């Protein structure tokens, strides 16, 4: 009976010592948070293991995560997966649907990224357009008009300049045959008769004003179809056209005239652009929006993934994942780190404490046996 009591007593004492030892050991992982000194001597085991080695632990955690968890290869594989493709494409589709549903304008879209489009157009837009036009004039002012126009346009004009004769004669014939043409001829005759006085009075003894006007009208109409008249018109138009082509830009427009045109054009362009920017994109560019929703979303998702994949190494170096994790861990309060580790390893820490009680009890059992037989 005495022997059994000794064994039980030793088991209980051993279990208590083993359990408390493990509890203290676990506690000493975190506490104390700072070193304590007696006179000039630091008390052993202060601070605790984790507070003492926090920077080293942060470095190792960052290294493990960068080299074994969030590796470039793993991120690249995840980025190229079908799930990532679908997620990016879905996000693009959602933004496009919002664009259509909310009737967003270009101005509203740019305002979401803190860009005042109207202000940009009125300041930078005007200055940029005027600057580009003035630079163009300075550079090309001594060149001929023909050399400044696109070759295709010059060729087209060369081929169709003769058509101007037909157009001009047809328009003149239509005008002369119209009521307005008849009235204008009569008005000019009235003025002519009034200015010439007696000479015209003698002419009116043989012909009435109406017959004179009618005769003039018929002759002018006939003249528009006369081959010689058309040849003269063609020659005049061709000569003027050739003169226009060979004229230098600064002869057609001097610097002040060009500056005035540049100012007016820049104001017109920026005003027009500003007005268009206030219209919903779906109204302004319906076909483009349809293209975005139908095809471009998939292509854009592929492009984003491709570009991210190509530049992933550079991005990861710039992000410095290891340094970021180290910095973040080092900013945590020690209380928070203790709470975090206990939450993660709570079950395991309890098992360690239980194991301390069990091992202590087993050791106490053997110590009891030794105490009985020795």
From Swiss-Prot:
The chain crosses the membrane at residues 4-24, 354-374. It is found in: Cell membrane. The keyword Transmembrane helix applies. Its main location: membrane. It comes from the Bacteria. GO terms for cellular component: plasma membrane. The keyword Ligase does not apply. Pfam families: DUF445. Keywords: Cell membrane, Membrane, Transmembrane, Transmembrane helix. It is a multi-pass membrane protein. PANTHER family: UPF0754 MEMBRANE PROTEIN YHEB (PTHR35791:SF1). Belongs to the UPF0754 family. This is UPF0754 membrane protein SaurJH9_1899. It comes from Staphylococcus aureus (strain JH9).
């Amino acid at each position: 009976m005495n022997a059994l009591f000794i064994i039980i007593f030793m088991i209980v004492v051993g279990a208590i010592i083993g359990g408390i030892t493990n509890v203290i050991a676990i506690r000493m992982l975190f506490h104390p948070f700072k070193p304590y000194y007696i006179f000039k001597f630091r008390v052993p085991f202060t601070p605790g293991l984790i507070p003492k080695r926090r920077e080293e632990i942060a470095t190792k955690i960052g290294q493990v995560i960068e080299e074994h968890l969030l590796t470039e290869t793993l991120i690249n594989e995840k980025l190229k997966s079908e799930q990532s493709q679908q997620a990016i494409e879905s996000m693009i589709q959602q933004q496009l649907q919002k664009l259509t549903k909310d009737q967003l304008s270009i101005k509203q879209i740019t305002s979401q990224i803190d860009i005042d489009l109207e202000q940009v157009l009125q300041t930078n837009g005007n200055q940029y357009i005027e600057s580009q036009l003035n630079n163009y004039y300075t550079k090309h002012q001594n060149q001929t008009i023909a050399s400044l126009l696109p070759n295709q346009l010059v060729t087209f004009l060369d081929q169709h300049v003769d058509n101007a004769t037909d157009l001009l004669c047809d328009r003149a014939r239509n005008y002369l045959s119209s009521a307005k043409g008849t009235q204008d001829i009569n008005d000019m005759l009235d003025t002519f008769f009034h200015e010439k006085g007696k000479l015209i009075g003698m002419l009116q003894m043989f012909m009435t004003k109406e017959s004179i006007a009618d005769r003039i009208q018929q002759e002018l109409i006939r003249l528009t179809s006369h081959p010689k008249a058309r040849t003269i018109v063609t020659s005049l138009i061709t000569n003027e056209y050739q003169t226009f082509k060979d004229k230098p830009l600064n002869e057609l427009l001097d610097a002040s005239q060009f500056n005035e045109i540049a100012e007016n054009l820049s104001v017109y362009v920026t005003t027009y652009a500003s007005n268009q920017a206030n219209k919903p994109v779906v109204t302004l560019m319906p076909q483009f929006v349809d293209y975005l929703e139908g095809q471009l979303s998939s292509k854009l998702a592929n492009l984003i993934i491709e570009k991210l994949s190509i530049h992933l190494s550079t991005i990861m170096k710039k992000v410095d994942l290891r340094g970021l994790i180290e910095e973040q861990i080092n900013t945590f309060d020690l209380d928070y780190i203790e709470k975090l580790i206990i939450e993660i390893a709570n079950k395991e820490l309890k098992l360690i404490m239980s194991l301390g009680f069990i091992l202590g009890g087993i050791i106490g059992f053997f110590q009891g046996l030794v105490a009985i037989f020795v």
